[in-house]
Amino acid sequence: MQHKLLINGELVSGEGEKQPVYNPATGDVLLEIAEASAEQVDAAVRAADAAFAEWGQTTPKVRTECLLKLADVIEENGQVFAELESRNCGKPLHSAFNDEIPAIVDVFRFFAGAARCLNGLAAGEYLEGHTSMIRRDPLGVVASIAPWNYPLMMAAWKLAPALAAGNCVVLKPSEITPLTALKLAELAKDIFPAGVINVLFGRGKTVGDPLTGHPKVRMVSLTGSIATGEHIISHTASSIKRTHMELGGKAPVIVFDDADIEAVVEGVRTFGYYNAGQDCTAACRIYAQKGIYDTLVEKLGAAVATLKSGAPDDESTELGPLSSLAHLERVSKAVEEAKATGHIKVITGGEKRKGNGYYYAPTLLAGALQDDAIVQKEVFGPVVSVTPFDNEEQVVNWANDSQYGLASSVWTKDVGRAHRVSARLQYGCTWVNTHFMLVSEMPHGGQKLSGYGKDMSLYGLEDYTVVRHVMVKH
């Protein structure tokens, strides 16, 4: 397994403390990797800064060609990437290969095309004898911090728009799941000029802090927890860096009496438990109107009970393990606290799976109240709660009564209601009669404590640029 860092076009061993990388399906150590030292972090940033002098001036065509080559290489090595992701994250291998790899390739190809569509405002005269134009230029060095739930996908979401816009990047994957990012570094080093892409390994305190706080870094992009986002914003405040934050969610799923219950059940069974629920847009907070509440709980409970947890390399496995032992304990604690309320009923699941690995049973909890922690706090595991509601006004207020604002969905056959409710929901995305669907052409991002900035789409590309005014006297 490729375990070296990429700094200034060279694969080098880390010079810091060694950290174990685990297989969450077994709990075994896959390998140990040495972190980047403080000197290596500095070298990576300075290499990116030096490379920016030329890369920032390349034509969109050149950047497009590089991104397309990288997309092709990822596609050609799709099986290798899927196997690494499966071993390091516990994802079902078939899901990693069939779902994630094509989407990752598409992200790079989309931004390869988008690079050639980015332009500033046409020139105009707003002062006599002067012509103004608006430019969209790259910022410089971008420090990108990727999470552990979708390591390669999130690396793609961060690298593709930053590079397409003409920036240089220093990427730090999670120390829990670094293997696909390090493999990507190996393949990318011969496609991009030295220093344009740098990939480090290490913990937040030892590598993340010196990286995001480096004076040469102009922007920090994070997908992670609210706590990590708060830390980075505070840590970088003195240098007034631009920050791009995607900080998790607790998606409300609003099911009205007239909804297609079978579609809801099928949707939540898939979208609430995909990736073992380790997804910031997971359909995890259901509000069911009282007329269909009992039916939905019964049918959804039966459906969730059929979900199969198992070995990642088993074609029939639908849920793999959680990412780490520490996260397994967090999920278990959240469910135990829900049970202790006395009014929340476990319909199915509600316990760790016996045996090796960090498995938690797919869980459905009914009778949750609006103020319960299981409704208000992100669990980030295979745990879905159901809360009954009376009417539209009540459920919209409840859905918005959350610190999160990333994703939501509305299930109804009433088109007017779908538009009305969608317009009032304080979430970056609202799906109607579906959930979880993402495409490269549309923006993904939140509001409130879920963060700000957009991934994917032309909006995502613009986030990695600075708007500049040039005025010419004539």
Swiss-Prot record:
Keywords: NAD, Oxidoreductase. This is Gamma-aminobutyraldehyde dehydrogenase. It is an enzyme of class 1 (oxidoreductase). GO terms for molecular function: aminobutyraldehyde dehydrogenase (NAD+) activity; NAD binding. Its EC number is 1.2.1.19, 1.2.1.-. NAD(+) binds at residues 146-148, 172-175, 209, 225-228, 280. The active site is at 246, 280 (nucleophile). HAMAP family: Aldedh_Prr. Homotetramer. One of its GO terms (biological process) is putrescine catabolic process. Catalyzes the oxidation 4-aminobutanal (gamma-aminobutyraldehyde) to 4-aminobutanoate (gamma-aminobutyrate or GABA). This is the second step in one of two pathways for putrescine degradation, where putrescine is converted into 4-aminobutanoate via 4-aminobutanal. Also functions as a 5-aminopentanal dehydrogenase in a a L-lysine degradation pathway to succinate that proceeds via cadaverine, glutarate and L-2-hydroxyglutarate. 4-aminobutanal can spontaneously cyclize to 1-pyrroline, and 5-aminopentanal to 1-piperideine. It catalyses: 4-aminobutanal + NAD(+) + H2O = 4-aminobutanoate + NADH + 2 H(+); 5-aminopentanal + NAD(+) + H2O = 5-aminopentanoate + NADH + 2 H(+). InterPro entries: Ald_DH/histidinol_DH, Ald_DH_C, Ald_DH_CS_GLU, Ald_DH_N, Aldehyde_DH_dom, Aminobutyraldehyde_DH, PatD. Pathway: Amine and polyamine degradation; putrescine degradation; 4-aminobutanoate from 4-aminobutanal: step 1/1; Amino-acid degradation. Belongs to the aldehyde dehydrogenase family. Gamma-aminobutyraldehyde dehydrogenase subfamily.
